[in-house]
């Protein structure tokens, strides 16, 4: 197993984690978002090729928990609504809405 260092916005831990885990009571959504965000950072782009099975294996969650988490993340505007790619190899768009607010 290789270890990569990742640099994530403080907003993810200071605001998003308490919001998703505490307020929304969706810790799986935070875990899935953290995985997708880390993968996006590693790839250097906002689109991450990741099937339900891949996300489940990488996070330790069940596929059904990943599905529920992705639905919640889409509703919250943290993952793009439209999946690109194929059903077997979907590409998920990772959104960072707080960056738009900070830039405004």
Regions found by a protein language model. Give the residues of each.
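Short recognition helix of helix-turn-helix/winged-helix DNA-binding domains
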Residues: 1-57, 87
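Winged-helix/helix-turn-helix nucleic-acid-interaction surface
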Residues: 62-104
